[in-house]
Amino acid sequence: MTSSNEQLVDALRASLKENEELRKESRRRADRRQEPMAIVGMSCRFAGGIRSPEDLWDAVAAGKDLVSEVPEERGWDIDSLYDPVPGRKGTTYVRNAAFLDDAAGFDAAFFGISPREALAMDPQQRQLLEASWEVFERAGIDPASVRGTDVGVYVGCGYQDYAPDIRVAPEGTGGYVVTGNSSAVASGRIAYSLGLEGPAVTVDTACSSSLVALHLALKGLRNGDCSTALVGGVAVLATPGAFIEFSSQQAMAADGRTKGFASAADGLAWGEGVAVLLLERLSDARRKGHRVLAVVRGSAINQDGASNGLTAPHGPSQQHLIRQALADARLTSSDVDVVEGHGTGTRLGDPIEAQALLATYGQGRAPGQPLRLGTLKSNIGHTQAASGVAGVIKMVQALRHGVLPKTLHVDEPTDQVDWSAGSVELLTEAVDWPERPGRLRRAGVSAFGVGGTNAHVVLEEAPAVEESPAVEPPAGGGVVPWPVSAKTSAALDAQIGQLAAYAEDRTDVDPAVAARALVDSRTAMEHRAVAVGDSREALRDALRMPEGLVRGTVTDPGRVAFVFPGQGTQWAGMGAELLDSSPEFAAAMAECETALSPYVDWSLEAVVRQAPSAPTLDRVDVVQPVTFAVMVSLAKVWQHHGITPEAVIGHSQGEIAAAYVAGALTLDDAARVVTLRSKSIAAHLAGKGGMISLALSEEATRQRIENLHGLSIAAVNGPTATVVSGDPTQIQELAQACEADGIRARIIPVDYASHSAHVETIENELADVLAGLSPQTPQVPFFSTLEGTWITEPALDGGYWYRNLRHRVGFAPAVETLATDEGFTHFIEVSAHPVLTMTLPDKVTGLATLRREDGGQHRLTTSLAEAWANGLALDWASLLPATGALSPAVPDLPTYAFQHRSYWISPAGPGEAPAHTASGREAVAETGLAWGPGAEDLDEEGRRSAVLAMVMRQAASVLRCDSPEEVPVDRPLREIGFDSLTAVDFRNRVNRLTGLQLPPTVVFQHPTPVALAERISDELAERNWAVAEPSDHEQAEEEKAAAPAGARSGADTGAGAGMFRALFRQAVEDDRYGEFLDVLAEASAFRPQFASPEACSERLDPVLLAGGPTDRAEGRAVLVGCTGTAANGGPHEFLRLSTSFQEERDFLAVPLPGYGTGTGTGTALLPADLDTALDAQARAILRAAGDAPVVLLGHSGGALLAHELAFRLERAHGAPPAGIVLVDPYPPGHQEPIEVWSRQLGEGLFAGELEPMSDARLLAMGRYARFLAGPRPGRSSAPVLLVRASEPLGDWQEERGDWRAHWDLPHTVADVPGDHFTMMRDHAPAVAEAVLSWLDAIEGIEGAGK
């Protein structure tokens, strides 16, 4: 074959192979498009107290009618609205419906929403939020685990009649009414609150909304728009408007009950509720081990088009719809057993729907197998936008229970239908629906919108699950933990109660599998508890008894230290149970046995198991090696379960164990030290000394023994816990003296005197036997209680271990150093019994391991649970069986116990303002404080307490809480609902009450009430202002003084008063803004200046407005907002923008020098030149950002400064930023628009005066305007994003050219809605989206400085 022929053959082979691959890919795509979608989770709430799909099924199966009268909380005055005679204007002849029991209830704090925003929110949004959280939990998915993933949100939401006219909205709800009552926000709020990044779509096709949403979600899953879809619908009737409107049409059933497909049908009947599904591709659900409740085989939507009328149903369209859905499912009509009908109970709609079903599903059916037809609306009314998904949940439950429930209120089938035209039967009685070999059970669900949009889906029973392998028993021989957590203590109590009821009721539950589900499918929150038991009954009992639970609260997890005590922890049989129940413990003990055996003539295991031939723990040369082995083996157990030390600390002989765990000694060397040293003690010191523990400080102890020369201080264990050692007779003498003086003293049961001069007699012997040790460099930080410092070199030689035995143990000072200077918050005593835990200071968390006579798996699991309850990250997988979160055999666990408060704006009558309640009251600040130089002074503790009380009152008032007690003192205010609006309102209130000039960002700089109170108290102390408890008159005046934001501007308080401010206002009104800037620049020369960064009189610490440390760990860039030059500027400029970066990136804002308060509380110094100011900022930024790459962002004049700062960082500090974001800058040479709009600019400054424009700030603005007016020396090499406003600030003549922001250097452009000011206020999310997209691009392509 010629070469050319060979090439041709090769080419043909390659082409055939490529074609085959293309065909395979085409088949894969086709299979993907046709793949059924799995329903893996469901949640719902309906009338009659229905809170779950199980409740719904129980009600439906029992044939319950859930219609009731209008709840009083709605405030409708139904007696005035009701008129039994139809057609009278403004009245309704119906007073019944299937109302939600708690439509006003909502756990706002759980979602970080303030009470005043919750009050402004449509209850439909609130219901969707809680149901969406629950659907993840019910699917066995931790809701926190989906944050940042491509979960799509598709929800149906119709009526939006909750909010009143925004002009008469309740006080304090301004800024929340629009978003709180926009149907578009309903889906977006779910995505925002849960961090979901797939599509977020709200559908309003009236009654078909949620089923249309389901159809769109199925398409999104098949197209790859999302990997998981949350689908739902909601309906809450906030006003009687729907009753009045449909009463005028006489379209409603007078008794409020749906009589679907019945001769007695007399109109629709309203219901309320929320229904949510969670869907995945079937293959994904199986791969992830998620339980499949049912599958959606097919769906279709269409429109009636130009039919009999806008709101009239259209039979041919419904028939076409059903055929479309069956085709999508690749099924025939006879493959479907039942249809959940739309069935609204109207005399027009029901016959049309029934005829469409007869013409489609009613044809071609086998004898005796009619299509069954029912409607959930007969139980729960017409739940409008929620009704479609509600019907899906009903049919999924019917599939699971094998029963088709009956439809209520059907006297007989409607005579408006020829039922003989096909094989369709109404479910007037319940019918069994068992599984059948060779035939899958299927159901159709219909929903038709009043505007003509129709939807139909086909459901199929879940595919058979392969037999699961038997669940392996947990490592602890049946002992399992059930962890529970909540956002608040009250919610935790409720959660515990729910789980206890679950353990009581669900006798089929496997405790180990339920434990795994609790771990895998529930978010770990701050308030925690754990029940430990070896059976369902034991766990139930533990949950019922407070003393049976481990409880804790997570604050700052801080750092973890392992503590290894000296003697005194031993007890006969310690560790014996764990030898049999903990493989990790047994393996570590076996290693120790091997290491000890060359130096001892007894067996470690025999001693632990108390074998008759084994020596007892009474001998020092036995107890010390055994205690060592137990401690290091327990350390291995802690590490196996995910708790690893960031430092180790040992007490006396405990330092040997600590050294081994730290890697500073090998196991062989550690065994040598502990055995040979204890043998020397037994041979030479035993019987010659004693030790005593005193409840005294070190200094008081020293004074006590100064005349007892045979005694010395052996150890300092705590502030009032000191150990003395020495001669036995003097020990007795000291004990008697202490007893006589009422001082607690305990003689330690040892007969030798460690840490005293007695030890000097064995110095030479220890030098000999411990010669040749090979100390290592510690791999885990080792803090020496002998040296009082870190051991960082291989220094633990024989001499060290002599000194360790001879000299004082500085345990308490060591703990203080680790806690105060090194950030250690958790100290785990790794021992068979705790002896040091109770000596730890209150500011740290002390945890034990085993306890005397309680050393088995139950105690170990309890100790591990205590660690988790107090905030440590436990590896639950090491404690629990390896199984999926929820297998088909596992009953559903209780969902989160939301803590509801009532939020409801009642409808107003003619000419009235709406009433509103947040738990039925106006939140006010009830009490005040007297401030100022004339007040009766409190001591420091009293002042801090008084200030904290004031902070709590004002925070409660701003958030519209019932009382200050609802505001957690140690939780960040952002997490309980503070945002940019409430932060400013709160700051204004506190400033007015105290006379201070706190910045609007103060709640972000000092995020918790405690931290904030400390800042305020310190500032008052600096000013020498006293604080006193308020008089009755002062208590009455505080709320008036703390008027809400907007009632009085910052300028009106006097804080912004001054000659220049008044002149500036006049200049703006006269359209002489630019001229006055020159005046301010000239006058600024008379303000004191600083000429080097070191001389800057302000703290320029950047304020963390959003994000967290996770981003830095990932190497993603930190965003730094460069505050602008405006006199009202500061880090608060970025409050609204930064909200969109929460959970995305760290967002810092750095102040500009010259605008704040100097260190002596006077006016800050101005920089002598721009580079000096930039250097001061650069130092602050580099300190705050650490090793993380930095992206600078500025708006307007701040944008110009951001570029100058980038150049300065690059050239003067060798730290070029990863990028620069310039938001609407107008640099020199391109300032014509600024000159034309100078008046609008000035007016904008006064309109946005969150920070009062004092004379000092105006002069600073003038100084920086002069700095930026001239040419600058260079340009930064960092990539630049230019974000431009899309709307002019004022009138603009086209012949002037382009008014938009300009930048001469290379850059990327993003245009966003709004003008120069509103882009950073009303359209801040659009700016954030542009910035985030650009950052992702530059980090993906260029690495963004990683």
Curated annotation (Swiss-Prot):
CDD domains: PKS. The modification O-(pantetheine 4'-phosphoryl)serine is found at residue 980. It comes from the Bacteria. This is Pikromycin polyketide synthase component PikAIV. It holds the Pfam family Thioesterase. Keywords: Acyltransferase, Antibiotic biosynthesis, Coiled coil, Multifunctional enzyme, NADP, Phosphopantetheine, Phosphoprotein, Transferase. It comes from Streptomyces venezuelae. Residues 1127-1332 are annotated as: Thioesterase. The gene is pikAIV. Cells lacking the TE domain are unable to produce methymycin, neomethymycin, narbomycin and pikromycin. Changing residue 207 to A: Unable to catalyze the biosynthesis of the 14-membered ring macrolactone narbonolide, however it is able to produce the 12-membered ring macrolactone 10-deoxymethynolide. InterPro entries: AB_hydrolase_fold, Ac_transferase_dom_sf, ACP-like_sf, Acyl_transferase_dom, Acyl_Trfase/lysoPLipase, Ketoacyl_synth_AS, Ketoacyl_synth_C, Ketoacyl_synth_N. Changing residue 652 to A: Unable to catalyze the biosynthesis of the 14-membered ring macrolactone narbonolide, however it is able to produce the 12-membered ring macrolactone 10-deoxymethynolide. Homodimer. Pikromycin PKS consists of a combination of multimodular (PikAI and PikAII) and monomodular (PikAIII and PikAIV) polypeptides each coding for a functional synthase subunit which participates in 1 (monomodular) or 2 (multimodular) of the six FAS-like elongation steps required for formation of the polyketide. Module 1, 2, 3, 4, 5, and 6 participating in biosynthesis steps 1, 2, 3, 4, 5, and 6, respectively. The keyword tRNA processing does not apply. Irreversibly inhibited by (2S,3R,4S)-2,4-dihydroxy-3-methylhexyl-phosphonic acid and (3R,4S)-4-hydroxy-3-methyl-2-oxohexyl-phosphonic acid.
